[in-house]
Structure formats: structure tokens, C-alpha cells
């Protein structure tokens, strides 16, 4: 007698014992239904209205939300962000890294040019950033072209880092295949001895980027799922054609709109 059952759908609720619970289900070929996993966000009285914008310049609005995130004791790294890049033929990749500066011109981050993201930015210099501040029920999404920062700026930032981090950047040819972790340990120890009394030179393959924002979307969660989304866009040729009734002028060349959640 054979059984034709290929998989089982398991509706997730908090198990009596956590350790190994998901691994146990996966090993049994179960499909985990996580639909019931949800939490309450904000109430309608806390909705993010257009009148609540601190500025019609989205970079200033970002600065306001970022400051709140930095001051929130439940957020460990307010500058943590997801960077999404894409190959020329449309294959995306994403990873978490840290924002290292922002200003009127854009968002700065540093990495290894030989990494996957570095190669993708070289062949397709456009990217998206996502900041998610879960305790505040807020998210900011940014899109735009990316350019390498001047070598001098990268050099200055590199040498502002702890020496151990500088050595780590030299040790790791990011995204390359290595035999094991011991390989990294040995190389790190060797370079630690080599540069004990001297400056660590910045590798040519390490540097920074700036993302020039063309789209910035501010999202705030609502318990009833009628989330707030206000998006700013620029670079639009609006001079010869009037804006629609739901599109509004922001500062400089920005316009903004409310999007359905």
C-alpha cells in the first residue's frame, strides 16, 4: 500500500517548545503556513498624514525619522539597511549593510568592489535601499543611480575605522571561495603582525558609493492594514504638463503622492 501524500500544510501557532520546531517540520516535508503570524501596528489616530510631514524635502523627512530611530532604545542599528542590486539581465540580489552617511546629495555606504554587489553596481549602476524600523512600524524605501565616491573620501573613511576592521577588509576578498574559516584566521593573524606598528593601506578593491535618490517612499504600518504610504519622486519633466490633482509639489524638483497600501 502506498500513500500519495506529497506534503502537509502546517498552520503555525506558537509551539509548546521552540528548539528545533521549524527544522523538525522541514525535515518531514511539511509546508509551514505562517499566515496567523501577525501583530498589531498603530491605530488610525496615529496615521501618517501629509500634514505630519516635517518637510517637503524627503531627505529632511528621512533625517527626522532616522533621528527617531536612533533615539529608540529598541533599535540596535538604526543605520542598518537592505541594499538591492541587479545584474544587467535582471537577476537581483540583496543584503544587509550599514549606511555610513547621508546628506542633501544622497546616501553613502562602503564595500568591496569585487563583491557581488560591487560587480553588479559596476555593470548596472542603479540600486534600492530599504530601512525597516520595526519598533516604530516604519519603513523607508529609496531608489536611484549609484556612483563611486572619490578615492580620497574612501581613504579617509577607511582609516577612521578600527584597525581590526581595516585588516579585516584586507583579509577578505569578499564573495570569493575560501577553503575554511581557519584560512581567514591565519591570514588575519599574519596581517595583524605585519601592520602592528604601521598603517594599514586601503586596498584598491575597497571603497565607497553614493546613491542619488530619485524615489523615496515613507511607509507607516496600521493595524487594519490600511498602511500609510507617501512617495516622493523627482527628475520628472513637469514643466510643460500640469501635475494631476493627486500629485503635489514638494521642495525643489520633488513631487509627492499618497499610494494605496
Swiss-Prot record:
It comes from Rattus norvegicus. This is Pyridoxine-5'-phosphate oxidase. Pyridoxal 5'-phosphate binds at residues 42-45, 100, 157, 161, 165, 225-227. The modification Phosphoserine is found at residue 241. The modification Phosphothreonine is found at residue 238. It catalyses: pyridoxamine 5'-phosphate + O2 + H2O = pyridoxal 5'-phosphate + H2O2 + NH4(+); pyridoxine 5'-phosphate + O2 = pyridoxal 5'-phosphate + H2O2. InterPro entries: Pyridox_Oxase, Pyridox_Oxase_CS, Pyridox_Oxase_N, Pyridoxamine_oxidase_dimer_C, Split_barrel_FMN-bd. Its cofactor is FMN. Pathway: Cofactor metabolism; pyridoxal 5'-phosphate salvage; pyridoxal 5'-phosphate from pyridoxamine 5'-phosphate: step 1/1; Cofactor metabolism; pyridoxal 5'-phosphate salvage; pyridoxal 5'-phosphate from pyridoxine 5'-phosphate: step 1/1. Belongs to the pyridoxamine 5'-phosphate oxidase family.
